Amino acid sequence: MFKHIEPVTIPEKKLFFEFKEKEMVNKLHRMIGKDNFNLLTQRLEKQGMKKGVTVLLYGLPGTGKTETVLQLGKTSNRFIMLADASKIRSKWVGETARNIKELFDEYRKTAKDLDETPILLFNEADALIGKRHDVADRGDQEMNTMQNILLEELENFEGIFIATTNLVDNIDKAFDRRFLYKIRFEKPGTETIFQIWRTKFPKVKPAILKNICSKVTLSGGQIENIRKKVTIDTILHEHFTVNEAYLMELAQQELLLENRIHLRHPIGFTRK
């Protein structure tokens, strides 16, 4: 139902955010650092408050929500337990609810076995915490039962729980107060996007990257896709040269599914 991600296996990545997101992400890094987290949980417990930290990261695809959680795990040296929604949900009566219970039981067991409290990550959480409907069939009843258990688990949660979603409007309102922090990830502005381009393509002239940024607005995830395509073409074609036309064409391709543009020319790379 989930996989363990060890902090040492997570590649370090520099992430770029707009001011508000950066401020909140930095707060999360400070909160779950070993010394601060232990102090926070002790103080909260002393004041009769629940010790769990629950966070919802929401916003457009490719804005760094999942990678943010991975970097939180790396910098705080915490294991990440990544829940697999497709394996939690079951067609068998009662099994989805049992799976949720087993997941949290396993989290508690793992937390006792480790030196540092792990992070429980529900990626694309709308599959599990989407809006509930009137019970029309057994599937609806099963989903509602599972969500009631999940609500109860989060109400009494002790640890670090982070959920991500691209579809915040689909999340059931009952989960609103279960999240201590709700952080919105916007598509980065021009200057932030330029910094991402420079990090991904340090050998390309800044003027070229600035020109691309002024014409095409992409997310960090889309720029990473371009970087991967460039790497593939560099491997496949000897004496491959990256030029502005080639990068612009790849940038435009990333927007095809958003129905913003239509390609009219072949990809403009040069090779000998």
Walk through the language-model features, giving the residues of each:
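Charged, amphipathic alpha-helical linker segments immediately N-terminal to NTP-binding catalytic cores
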Residues: 2-30
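Walker A/P-loop NTP-binding motif of AAA+ ATPase domains
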Residues: 19-214
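C-terminal alpha-helical "lid" subdomain
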Residues: 1-12, 178, 187-272
